[in-house]
From Swiss-Prot:
Bias kind Pro residues: ranges: 587-596
Record field: compositional bias (Low complexity): 40-54, 116-126, 429-440, 715-725
Biased composition (Basic and acidic residues): 57-67, 127-140, 467-485, 512-556, 622-635, 798-807
InterPro entries reported for this sequence: Zds1/2 (IPR040206), ZDS1_C (IPR013941)
Keyword Cell wall biogenesis/degradation: yes
Record protein name field: Protein zds1
Biased composition (Basic residues): 702-711
The organism's taxonomic lineage, starting at the top: Eukaryota, Fungi, Dikarya, Ascomycota, Taphrinomycotina
CC per GO annotation: cell division site; cytoplasm; cytosol
Intrachain S-S bonds: none
Gene Ontology terms describing biological process: cell wall organization; establishment of cell polarity; meiotic cell cycle; positive regulation of G2/M transition of mitotic cell cycle; signal transduction
Main subcellular location: cytoplasm
Amino acid sequence: MSSSSVSNTLSIETKSDPKDPAFVASQESTECNEHDTTQLSGSSSEPLENNSSLTRSTDDPSVEIRSKLVSPDNEANLLSDQNITISNENNNENDTTEEAETSSGNEAADDEDSSSDAQSSVPSFSEIHDGMSEEELDKERKTLTHLRRISLQGADDPEIPTDWSVAMSPPETEQDASTLFWVPANLHPELNPTGWKSFLDLQVKNLKSPTATDTSSSPLEHIRSLRRRKSLLSRQVKADDAVINYQDGSPIVEKAYLKRHRSLRLNELEHLESLARDPHRMVSLVDGMSNGSPEDSPLLVSPNHFLQRSSRTTIRRTGASIRTIHRGKTSTLSGNRSHSILQKPTDTSPLHKIEPISADELVESDDSRTSALSNSQNPSDDVENQSDQALEVLSLTNPPKIDNASADTTLHKETNKIDKLYVSENKAESAVASESSLSEGTLALKAPAPENKPEKSSTSKPPVPENKAEDSVVLKSSVPEDKSENSIASKPSATEGIPENAIALQSSVPENKAEDSVVLKSSVPEDKSEDSVPSKSSVLEDKHENSVEIDKKADDSLPSNNKTEGYTPSVVREEKNYSEPNASPSVIPPRVPTPVPGRTLSPKPTRIPTPIPSSLNVSLESSKKPEIFHERHIPTPETGPNKPSKNNILKSTQVPVTPKQKSSTANKGSTSSPSPPSSESKKTKRSWGRLFVSGDSDKEHKEHKKDKQKKKNDQISSSSKSASSFKKDRDKESIFGSLFGSKKKQTEIPPVSSSPPHNDAPPKAKPISAPSELPNTTSVAEAKCQTVTDDEGTDQQSDEKSTEPKTFIPDKDYYWSRFPICTERAIYRLSHIKLSNAHRPLFQQVLLSNFMYSYLDLISRISSNRPMNNVQQSTAKPIRKDINGQQRRSEFSAENVKNELENLSYQFGDQRKRNLNRKGSTIHTVSQNIQKVSKNAK
């Protein structure tokens, strides 16, 4: 009865769509409440009064679920507030209900006891209501409603944006799941630090002022959807697409591409050519352009001016060696230029109206330019200025436009004048070249280079014209000014700025010894020669006290049939160069010498040719043949198969001198030693010995070796023979044998002084003998006499010296040097560390990587040239002793320490390579190997 009355009395006014999920939720809640009332109505009327009322306001579109405990005091207010009308259909029914309730009082008392027990176990609504405020209840209801909606819509997909009004609310507890919000991947702090920071700032701002929370300010508002979009290329063109206004875009794209990348057409090229011919139109066209940036302005180049490659290229290398390459004569260049002038287009532009320059003015300007060149002090600048004269003169000659016929005649006249002018210039230059070639006496000069690098030295072979045979050369010794000048420079054929009488031929000798340089002088009358010779050379000549003695000894060494009273011998220095006897008439330009600081070249004097003396015929014949100069030391047959023997060394060129020198040389007298007769005949066979090792050189080498061995058999004891053979075997198996080629580059002239072995000369930079015994011994004949007339004690001393090990000095014997292995490893590791820094500038990274790779190349080269068995043999060798049995040097000398350090470094390097290949290597094995190496060293 009570259930039916409840259903009749509770009427819920709802005006909404039954499909609304909020309406469904309200229906579910009403069903639950009705079920509760049916259970409680049978026992008493209090559950009916305490029943929670459900309402839906017609004004509010949303549904609010409210649970309130209703007391009998505010029952009327509650009913009026929530718009629930309870119709009293029959007062009799109310009375009957009250009677029924009172009649069943005893039963209700029993039921209340059982219900009170159930309420004691479950918390009642009053207890929950007392602990929560109204705002908290409203918040909980909103959260439940939001979760209900998400669960009904299936919002478990994280691609759906969250409700920022709920997600940005202040958290209740740290473990509350509702306070967590989903952050998209593009706001990750490592991927997008600025976006993450702005997102956190927005969170803090919303937490501080929750009323100003705006859901539209979320960082995801620009994201349409996180789902994968459909590909735009997935659509296929169909036949019926034309109905839907489909248009193929490929022709449009192709037209746009051709418009951007098409080449110039013929009419456009013609238009550009016409603009180039008429600069006024070009200027007016450019002025008419608006908003043109200055860097976009066109380059107005006249069509008759064109870029031409220089006729000469000067290649500058380190080491003061300059090489000049000529590509053509100035006459051909002038002919080409005149041809281009004849083809000059006709235009009335004022830019091209230049008054013609007469040939006389050209000659005057050329003479002034030549005189200025002769007064300059820089030889390299003179060479460059001399070759640029043709282009400078031709650039000034640009005749104006008159008539066609008159212009042709004028142009022909001007070009003929220019051609004649430059033909005369070429003749003068060829005369200068012939003078320089004869003054040098066809001496093949080149810069000194290490013996294992012949490609760095260039050869100059000027010809010897017979009609210029009256020129003579006087060779005098002078002191060089700089030790670093290692190049012997000859006078260029086309150089006018360098006087003929002041060409210095310099060669360097190691340490502090005075060098002997050769100055070539042209023989002129006495008054002219005194004026033209620089005063510095005379002062330097006075400084050398031993120059007279050298000339005297060299004079004695000349052949008797070539000796005349008026000739003075020249100081000969051997050079690793061979000239071809039948040289071509074309002049190969020699190296241009670098200017020496502090040295002033005197201007070129007027040349007065002297008649050819009858006694000069023999000297001319010998001057036509190539001559060999000593540069640093006198090599012997042991200097390699491509080196000349003593028999192949020619005497110096014999030339006439001034009367003063005749009087000075007439007083000299001495016995002359005959020279080998086969020197000239053998020399002609070895013209290209530098480039090709011929069989003749090997035969000569063997023959000379046999002769020398026969001479030594009478003087050298058996012990010295065994020592020399031991030395040869040691040289073959030496550590640096493969690095420096053969050991035959050492000189065979025995040093007289007993200098310590570690001061022995490197093959390229050590004098022949000690300064105390052989001062400035430079002539070939004197060196021969020294080798032949040496006594037995000197030979034994040289043989004893040969048994000592050869010590190589860094930066003298070889161009590389190594640090201790620990230092090298530290440098290498530091380079790796520095290279790993990406902020380091690029040029520093390049320098470091170049250093590392050059270091690795050096280590690999040394390791490949130094086998380990030789290293172990060298470590096991006992300390060498003299013939007398005395210890030669200390065990802890610099050489022994250096050798031991190198052995340790190589052993450790190989062990490290093996450890890298074998992954299971440990530090213990490395230490054991080091101990073994140290034991072997001891």
